[in-house]
Each structure stands twice: as structure tokens, then as C-alpha cells.
């Protein structure tokens, strides 16, 4: 691993540049010693308690109940990313240990291991039809393997320090954003490439439109661009003097490919449209926005959601640009990612390791899934199987079944 460099994590915005002189604080010293003493009295066969105590001492949180259907624990470091195969019982995960694994979501058995990355694997994914699986590390080394041919490598490339990587939603095209601001677009497996030029700022976040023809990109400078992937030109461009003045951390689009919501690390969130900036949902404040969503399919009005690193989840009326609901949470924990689920449910991965779900119409919490002992880095939803794949700083990935709506 090159200098053991992880990607930007949500906690970066909260802790800044403070150092702790190498000390790891896991709570009151007496409590830790008591835990060690208690562990010494536990029968050696109680493996589950051993693992829970190890996680508690390492991360400061002991899991009381694990709601997961399956836990994958082959990684030897934080697990940063994951993806689910569109039809097969397969997941792929990547982590700080410079490795990626393809594994069976029913048994946990490893199907394929990618061990030749030299830095943290921060992006993985299956192509839209499951034919290919891609892995990419923070240094920009990307590999693509053909699933049905015993994971034969069909393509590789080094693009320079990478921020994100994702597959196109309807073709064998792979996209990646770089620290230098360029966005690479490759045909797989031929490797034919075109580049969407940058401008001295990270291509921090990106989202394809529903028709797959355009790519919205948020940059570290606060710039927002909507690129036409066929002509290689920006259709919309909003510069920092009008929109965000700082790093855009997340963005999402609507079903009609006409509007986007953006969130930034200064707490601001904007609505972008065909003519540029349409309005600001939230002005800069002390709560960095880490995740956004827009336009729940089939709902009566167009809504958007913003999740902050302080744990606030807000549902917005897009047309009126007003707050509709603030979701209730008696123990708020920083939100790292948001997903729409079935039955008018919005789901959040959190810094506390809990996966939470709310009815976004009322803001009432529907479920809280426990199992992770440290921050959740990624969550992925499979609508057909109604399951969630989660990845965490606790070195594990887990499969959860979504609880039935009450």
C-alpha cells in the first residue's frame, strides 16, 4: 500500500487536521481493563464474544446484536466500497488492505481475489449486465475482469490519483474521476478512451442521468458541470461565484434528467437545472453535507434529501424549495450515504455503524440495523432481493435483509 493512503472519509470534515500523537482512545481505561479481565474468564470456544470484544477495543463500540444475515471478514483493513451483481448471488468489495474480493452473498465463500493493487481499493463494480467486474485503487490503477471466464483480466489502465469509478448504466463503458479534475471514459474491453477536461480541481463526485447520455460532475472548487457524453462538451456549468464556494461532496439527479441536487462540505445544498442554478435549499452552515438524493420514483411530488455529518436528515419539496420533513432520530449519528428503498423508505449508512431507515413522508424511523462496530463507508441496495450490502471501517462487509414495513 503506497504510504497506506485511504480515501477521503466523512470524518475528515469533522476532525480537521488535529493529531492524537498516535494514541488510540477507546473509552475509560478502567472499562477497557474490565473488558480484558472479563474476556480472560470467558471460555475459549465463545468465538463470537471474542470478536465483539476485539472490535470494541479497536473501535470503541461493542455490538450488542448483529442483525446481519451474513458477515464477510476476509479484509484486513477498512472496507471502503462494495457492489452487488445484478443477477447472481455475488458481491465485490475493496479495502484499505489493497485487495478486492468477489464473494458469494449466501455463503461468504470467496470466488475471486484481486491481490495486485498497491494502494487502497476505493471503487469496485459490476457492469450493468454482470459480464465484467472492475476494481480501482486510489493511485488510479484500474482492472477489469470477465466474470464468466474465470475472472480473466481483459483490461487495465493507470489514470493517476483517482476519486471515483463507476460503470455506465446501460453499456460496457467505465468512467473514473481524477484528483487532477479529468474524467476518463473508456469502452471495455477495447480501451478506447476520451477525456472530459478538468480545471485544477478534483472531480469529487459524479452521477449519470437516467438516460445514460449525460454525466453530472461536482468539483473540489465548487464547480458543477453537466457533460454531454456524446459530444464531450458541458451543457450546464455553474461556477463557485454563483453556486457552491467549496468542495461538492455529493449530487443526485431526477427521473426526467432535468434537475440535480448538490451538497457541499460547508453545509450548502443547491438545485441545478437546465439554465444553471435554480435555487439554494440550505445556505452554508456548520453541518457538512455528505449525501443527497432526489426524486423518489412514483411519489406524488418531486422531493430531495440531504444528510449531514451531524446526523440530520432533511426531506425537501423541490418545486417550492422548502423543507418538507426533518426525519426523527433520538440518537443521531453522522450520515455517510443515502439510498431510496421500497415502500417510501429512505435509508442511511452512518458514522456510528448503524443502518437506519425512515418513512420519508412522515420522517418517522422504521428500522435501525445493528452489526457494524465502526463507521459505515458504503451501502448498496438490491431492490429485487430487498437486501443491503454494507461496508465498514470495522474490516467487514455485511448482508442485511430490509425489515418489512409496518
Which positions does each model-derived feature cover?
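WD40-repeat beta-propellers
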Residues: 100-103, 142-146, 183-187, 224-228, ...
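Canonical WD40 repeat/beta-propeller blade segments in eukaryotic WD-repeat proteins
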Residues: 77-83, 119-126, 160-167, 201-208, ...
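Hydrophobic beta-strand positions that form the internal "hydrophobic ladder"
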Residues: 91, 133, 174, 215, ...
